[in-house]
Amino acid sequence: VALAAYLPELGITHLDLSENKIGMTGAKVLANSTGFASVVCLDLRDNPILKSGRAALAASPYKTALNVINLGGERVDKAEAKELRKAFGNGVKVMIRA
């Protein structure tokens, strides 16, 4: 996550950070990084991101290229699942565990 700003320079569009202990803070850092703008597919399954981390990703102004985000592994209630899908938009496949 510390190298998120360099993702475009490295040509990284598919980022698999599953099972990497990326927490709420890491999710917020990624969400606020300009490098997030180049990510098309983001796999964050099985990380303790928590609700505020998921909300930060959904609210990120840099999620413009995103097509798929995997937030599976944490329980997400139906109301939050609906909010996340709405925040990410119709063009993004949001994978969660409800």
Question: What do the predicted segments below correspond to?
Answer:
Residues 1, 21-28, 48-55, 75-82:
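Short, solvent-exposed loop/turn at the beta-strand->alpha-helix junction
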Residues 5-11, 15-21, 32-49, 61-62, ...:
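Concave beta-strand-loop units of leucine-rich repeat
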